[in-house]
Every structure is written in C-alpha cells, then in structure tokens.
Amino acid sequence: VQNSLAYLKEKGAVWLVSRGHMGTYIEKLDYRRLQECGMNKGLLGSMPLPYSVSYQGLATALYRVLDNFEFNLVYTRGSESRLQLVAEGVYQFTVCSLYAAEKAMKNRTDIEIAGNLGLGSYLSRHVLLLRDIGAEGIQEGMRVAYDRTSLDQRDITDMITSGIRGIRFVELRAHQTVNAIRGGMIDAGVWNMDEIIESGYQGLHIIPLDDLVDVSKFSTAALVIRRGEESLKQLLQRYVKTSEIRKIQEDIKKGRIPVDY
C-alpha cells in the first residue's frame, strides 16, 4: 500500500497530508491521472445512435458526470453487438435496455450489470403503430415491421404477434416504420414514442402496449461491463448517479441546457 501511494504521489495523481498521530490523509485526487495509472487505456463506452432527445440527454449526461476522466462514447446500432464488444474488451461498458442486458446474461456469464438508470432513462415507451385507423391491434394477415438487428423491437413484436395467424413479417429498420406505414408497405409496427413526438408525426394511429407487454425494462437504461472488472464497476457506480443522469436528461428535454456529446 505504501509503495502504491508513493507511486501515485510521484505521478501527481494523489496529494497526501500528514496529521501527526492521526495518520496521513488524502488531500486531493486527480482522477484523470489515477485513470492513467490504473487503466491501460481511456474509458470507452458505447450506446445507441442519439436520434432521440432521450438518447441525446443520456449521452450529454455521461460526458458531464465522467468529465474528470479520459472518456469517449461510440454510437452504434444493435445491443447484441455492443454487448459482445464489451465482453471482448473493445468497450469498457455499453448502455442498453435493462431487458436486453438481462436477456443476454441468461445465456452468457462474461458480462454483468454495473448500473440501472431508472424507468424512462432509455426511452419513454414503445407503442404500436397501425395503418388502419379502425383497427384495435394486430390482426390476422397483417404485414408487420420486423427489425432483426434491434433486440428490443424484435422481441416486443414477437410478444404481441404470438398466436396470431397469417402474420407476414416485413424486414426493415425500426426507424423506417413510420414511413413504411404511410407508404403502404406495412400494416403495423413497433416504434418508440420519443421519436414520434420529436419528429412531429401527425395522423398516426397509436396503440399503447402497456396492457400487452411489460414495457418497463425496455424503457430502463442499464450500464453493462465485462464481468470481474470491479474497479470499473465501482467507478461507474460512484460517478454515474441515476438522479444526476435523469436531471440532465430532463434539462435537455426542457431546453434548459444545450446538448453536448
């Protein structure tokens, strides 16, 4: 311990003050220097493309709370691929839905959840969009949007179409759902309400999914790391506080602070 403290002091990562018989206390820490001493590379996280205000707020919040560190975010589609890259050590952590994190952990033991950012931190909610304004839900013979690259959209779609005969899945990216419905390519599709509101889409037949699917875990953001990275886990739990992340997200939504990611 003494050798480690001496090394950190020499590197300018820690300042110590002696208080006689009371011992030696840490007076100041330089977290960026500590990171350089304790990690062989900068802190690199990943999350979905910031196409919605919720994601933009989340990205801004992460940069703010981790400002003392050499930190960068990579934006990429597909929670499954992001989780795999965390397991391989390419990213130190990723942000995905709590549903995606828990589902992945049922089939693998090399990742773990380091933080839960609370309901609504990932997105407000998923909804069902229908082309027929008279329809009350998905019916036999409908053409339904299906995005194999989006675990959340794919699994919600599987849940709400289970047992319905004659469904024809039309493969397309989830973000193309609205245009596909308006263009007559599909009859139904699952998409998130944030994007619908923020894009100002009008005249859509929207059905809430709360009565059909437990959407809470799809709306909750989770921080996932490689299992066994205890120092990283403690760092994230100390600095990425749910209350602070949510406040920054809300400030972004209300226009109180600028987006910065």
Language-model-detected regions and their locations in the chain:
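Short helix-initiation/N-cap motifs at beta->coil->alpha
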Residues: 73-85, 168-182
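Conserved hydrophobic residue
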Residues: 14-16, 91, 186
